[in-house]
Design a protein with these regions (language model features):
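Active-site-surrounding "flap" and adjacent substrate/cofactor-binding loops of secreted or lumenal enzymes
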Residues: 34-40, 45-110
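Positively charged n-region of N-terminal signal peptides that target proteins for export
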Residues: 1-4
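Short, solvent-exposed loop/turn elements at domain surfaces
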Residues: 50-54, 176-177, 491
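C-terminal motif of bacterial Sec signal peptides marking the signal peptidase cleavage site
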Residues: 15-16
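Noncatalytic, helix-rich "gating/capping" subdomain that lines the substrate-entry/channel surface
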Residues: 84-376, 380
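Short, Gly/Pro- and small/polar-rich lid/capping loops
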Residues: 20-30
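Intrinsically disordered, low-complexity linker/terminal regions across diverse proteins
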Residues: 70, 221, 256-259, 278-282, ...
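Hydrophobic/aromatic-rich, well-ordered segments within soluble, folded domains that form packed cores
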Residues: 31-52, 182, 186-205, 571, ...
Length: 675
């Protein structure tokens, strides 16, 4: 791990990237739709050609540049997995684990022959319950092997003391994406609930229950999940960290919710010596105690049976997996067919043994020069953000000083971790069923989680994504930004591209993650990662006033007839998109001011910067997925990450000659002006 500090002198450009005759534009003109005017629909103008050339296939609810790169990575990972599977490796070796797990998922003949037999012991454990007092201990036993329950628990950073881990208890127990799916009464949502009820009935029947039994159990499940959802915080409410922070002593927890046997629950989970914890969502957990007290034992059993059925739905027969896809894939997202089995198998291996694949992936596909280039880019972006902070006339010197301190202590992680996860204690046994191996892997993960975190300080070297992941993140409690190797490829990053391309793509990604440290959530954490106020009262008021502009703007965007974007839900990501563009353009200007880039293919460097940014968000999406994402995703839809964000960037207007006559025009006084 390396800490990168802002230099006192302005960083220069990226060496060869500003050598005119060596580096390339990398803007693919075929991606454009020049029949569209930039000021009318910039998303279509910049990406319409790509959309036309990449229509949605039946396996996708949405497909964009992120997905295209993930497909490329998939092919690379597939080759690595097949190499491991082809080796005659010793039992217990990493190669054996990778190869046998992949082969188990691929072996549909065996899984179909086994039917539901692999999970019958779990179902029998649930059915054998005689007293309500057995529910919580059973839930703990199930939880440690990957079967969900009425709520969730885990060990994570204490936001008030970022060096310490603490136990947390969180809302959970529902199988629809958000609480609104249980309560909204528009026709589309009511139809989704009806389809969900059908799905539950069909799944119980596939596990051997009669139609009458399945229908009765479905009603019990829906009643309990609806009660749980009603007490959940919404995603918007959860964006306020303090809404999910209620620290108390263990004795206070027992007094607050006496209807749950906490000693037995945590003893089974291997967590002992609890002194204090965070009851993140008290109303939801109180409702669990009320449900156990008020509902008939038969209903509680039906609910726990459902948790087994749902949690194992992709581990058994093709018929059960297809039934699950029909609801979650088709009804909720609009997909027509499942992905090929090899992709599903690869995703299982990648999700369960990610660091094994990550180490192989980095060795073969991530050149050291890419890490060096990214390190320089990050330094340049940090300098630019410092300049942007200084340029904010609305902010006091006191708050600016604290902002610089936070920026100067960013931890930057690029490419891959310095240490890899150890899987030596995990057994993948091909003599057992795939479902039984899933239980083993889940228990391994839980025991590893407890061993590494309970009673231990926060590991600031920990990575929260594998190197092959096509994404990036900012973690406020460690004040770190992370860019895995997987995203450091075209169309985000290209070693042979000029600065206009790289600053417009990966530069904005870097700036986006940096801005998260100063968005409506991140600004509430200090340089050490603690939830602490470092703003003057007046500056905080001005920040909230300014960001309300973008909330109101996105609230007015109609993403489907009768469905608007949620400006509050997406506020943090929208601020980060805006900040990423502002910071990266500043860094781009710094890098090229002494060595300006030429016009290429009729586009100025500034135009290529914004085309490169927009190209990252090229994609197509189904209406069902638009509805699902609008209700549940903190990110704006790709179209609006272009058409909703660029109209708030003054330099974009200059680059493309946008005027008040253009539909995307936003008066300057109504534009977001922050960072």
């Amino acid at each position: 791990m390396k800490r990168i500090f802002i230099c006192t002198a302005l960083a220069v450009g990226l060496g060869a990237c500003t050598t005119k005759n060596v580096m390339e534009s990398k803007i693919d003109l075929k991606n454009l739709d020049t029949t569209q005017k930039p000021g009318t629909d910039f998303f279509q103008y910049a990406t319409g050609g790509w959309q036309k050339a990449n229509p949605l296939t039946d396996e996708y609810a949405r497909y964009g540049q992120f997905d295209a790169l993930r497909e490329q990575n998939r092919e690379q990972l597939k080759a690595l997995v097949l190499e491991q599977a082809a080796e005659k490796s010793a039992f217990g070796s990493n190669s054996q684990k990778v190869g046998d797990l992949y082969n188990m998922v691929m072996d549909s003949t065996r899984r179909n022959a086994e039917g539901t037999t692999p999970v019958k012991p779990l179902m029998q454990q649930v059915a054998s319950i005689k007293e309500k007092s057995e529910i919580i201990p059973l839930m703990a036993k199930m939880y440690r092997v990957g079967i969900g329950g009425f709520f969730s628990t885990g060990i994570g950073t204490d936001i008030m003391n970022s060096n310490a881990n603490q136990l947390g208890i969180y809302q959970g127990g529902v199988s629809l994406p958000e609480k609104e799916y249980y309560s909204d009464n528009d026709e589309i949502t009511k139809n989704i609930r009806a389809k969900y009820r059908e799905y539950i009935v069909n799944m119980f029947k596939l596990h051997g229950f009669t139609a009458e039994e399945a229908n009765a159990k479905m009603k019990a499940v829906m009643n309990i999940e609806t009660r749980l959802a009603a007490k959940h915080l919404s995603r918007v409410e959860r964006r306020n960290p303090m809404n999910s922070y209620h620290k108390m002593s263990y004795a206070e927890l027992k007094n607050t919710i006496p209807g749950i046997d906490w000693d037995r629950y945590y003893s089974i989970l291997g967590i002992n010596g609890i002194e204090e914890l965070n009851l993140a969502h008290p109303e939801a957990v109180k409702e669990v105690a009320a449900i156990i007290d008020e509902c008939p034992l038969a209903d509680l059993i039906a609910y726990m049976e459902w948790k087994v059925i749902r949690s194992t739905s992709n581990e058994l027969t093709d018929e059960i997996e297809a039934e699950t896809f029909a609801f979650y894939g088709t009804v909720l997202s609009g997909k027509k067919v499942q992905q090929p089995r090899w992709k599903r198998a690869l995703d299982v291996v990648n999700g369960s043994l990610g660091d094994i694949l990550g180490e192989l992936y980095v060795a073969k596909h991530f050149p050291p020069a890419a890490k060096e280039r990214m390190t320089q880019l990050v330094k340049n972006l940090q300098i630019a953000l410092g300049e942007r902070i200084d340029a904010q006339e609305w902010m006091s010197a006191e708050t600016k000083k604290a902002a610089h301190e936070k920026l100067n202590t960013f931890t930057v992680k690029i490419g891959y971790p310095d240490k890899w996860d150890d899987y030596s204690k995990l057994t993948v046994d091909p003599s057992l069923s795939y479902a039984e191996n899933c239980r083993r892997m889940s228990e391994f993960d839980w025991e590893k989680h407890v061993a590494e975190k309970w009673g231990k300080p926060v590991d600031r070297d920990e990575w929260h994504m594998t190197p092959q992941t096509v994404n990036a993140y900012y973690n406020p409690t460690t004040n770190e930004i992370c860019f895995p190797a997987g995203i450091l490829q075209y169309p985000f990053f290209d070693m042979n591209a000029d600065d206009a391309f790289n600053y417009g793509a990966i530069g904005v990604v870097i700036g986006h993650e940096m801005t998260h440290g100063f968005d409506d959530q991140g600004r509430q954490f200090d340089k050490d990662g603690n939830f602490a106020n470092w703003w003057t009262e007046e500056d905080a008021r001005k920040f909230n006033e300014r960001t309300q502009v973008i909330v109101d703007f996105f609230n007015e965007i109609e993403v489907l007839p009768g469905l608007n974007a949620n400006g509050k839900l997406t506020l943090g990501e929208n601020i980060a998109d805006h900040g990423g563009l502002m910071i990266s353009m500043q860094a781009f200007k710094n890098a090229t001011k002494n060595n300006p880039l030429p016009v290429i293919d009729g586009f100025t460097p500034e135009q290529r910067f914004y085309l490169s940014y927009s190209n990252v968000w090229a994609g197509n999406v189904r209406d069902e997925e638009i509805r699902n994402l609008t209700k549940s995703d903190v990110h704006s839809l790709s179209r609006w990450r272009v058409n909703g964000t660029l109209p708030h960037i003054n330099d974009w207007y200059k680059a493309f000659g946008i005027t008040e006559k253009d539909p995307l025009f936003v008066p300057e006084e109504e534009r977001l002006n922050i960072w």
